[in-house]
A protein has these predicted regions:
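Extracellular beta-strand/loop-rich beta-sandwich domains predominantly from IgSF
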Residues: 57-80, 89-91
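Proline-centered linker/hinge motifs at extracellular inter-domain junctions
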Residues: 3, 106-112
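N-terminal Sec-dependent signal peptide, specifically the hydrophobic helical h-region
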Residues: 1-13
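Extracellular/luminal immunoglobulin-like beta-sandwich modules
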Residues: 82-108
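Solvent-exposed, conformationally flexible loop/turn segments
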Residues: 15-20, 118-119
Length: 121
């Protein structure tokens, strides 16, 4: 079943409110061919690693590792959305593109306790 606004080519990823999340890239090409890794959120650039250039982050909210993994720090509800990674070689040829639809799970505001009477089981 597809919901309005969902991308059929994206992988749904769940993150926990107030926790960090790593978006790992399945099928990441582990070779010297990788020259440029770009991450976008809802079509806006958020992080980029280009060979022989320092890491570029749009915000302190994100870290990116050399294997392309994007770390999102301290998830908030407004961090949900479509994240896309694009990996290119030195000739600008696209080696891999992946999309992730991030959903945020909130914490329960009230603790739940179960009280069993003696002999109830």
């Amino acid at each position: 079943m597809l919901f309005v606004g969902e991308d059929p080519e994206s992988t749904v990823v769940w993150g926990a409110l107030d926790h960090d999340l790593n978006l790992d890239i399945p099928g990441f090409p582990r070779s010297d061919k990788v020259a440029d890794i770009k991450w976008n959120r809802n079509k806006n650039k958020i992080a980029r690693i280009k060979k022989d250039m320092p890491l570029h982050n749009e915000m302190d909210k994100y870290d990116m590792f050399t294997n392309g993994t994007l770390k999102i720090k301290t998830l908030m509800r407004n961090d949900s959305g479509l994240y896309e990674v694009e990996i290119y070689d030195s000739n600008g040829v696209n080696l891999l593109s992946k999309k992730f639809d991030l959903k945020i799970q909130g914490k329960s505001l009230t603790p739940k306790f179960l009280h069993l009477k003696t002999g109830a089981i």
